Regions:
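Conserved catalytic core of nucleotide-sugar-dependent glycosyltransferases
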Residues: 1-86, 102, 125-129
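Catalytic donor-sugar/metal-binding loop of nucleotide-sugar-dependent glycosyltransferases
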Residues: 90-114, 121-124
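Intrinsic disorder/low-complexity detector
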Residues: 34-36, 92, 119
Length: 130
């Protein structure tokens, strides 16, 4: 419950660790001791700017609406979100126009994992218990 209360306060884009993603124990932003963004840690880079799992970020409703309005005004300045497996998060976050260093980092500055990706949990349980 605490996790969702934190997400509710997201103004622009928030990020947080997600457990058991893509063969790794965690997918998370990596921060320094002062809470400043250093890089993303994820099992798959793929040349993405935003190396983050879909379950590892939230967008504030007001920010989303503001960016959607801008998208409708000036479509030429936005990345068209064509489907490409593994790049959905990247395209979406590029259009939100918030660089990773400006993200709101939740879960005690990304030190605690409060969410696991259920797709991968199902995969792991199938492998280990069948």
């Amino acid at each position: 419950m605490e996790y969702f209360l934190q997400i509710r306060k997201t103004k622009t884009v928030s990020a947080f660790p997600v457990g058991i993603v893509a063969g790794q124990y965690v997918s998370t932003p990596v921060l320094n001791k002062n809470g400043k963004f250093i890089k993303f840690f994820d099992g798959w880079n793929g040349g993405r700017k935003y190396i983050i799992d879909m379950a590892g970020f939230a967008v504030g409703v007001n920010h989303y609406v503001k960016m959607a309005d801008k998208f409708n005004e000036v479509k030429r300045n936005f990345t068209i979100m064509k489907f490409r497996r593994g790049y959905e998060e990247n395209s979406f976050l590029i259009n939100m126009r918030v660089p990773p260093k400006k993200f709101e980092f939740l879960c005690d500055n990304c030190q605690k994992v409060k969410l696991c990706d259920l797709f991968y949990i199902k995969t792991y349980f199938h492998v280990f218990f069948t």
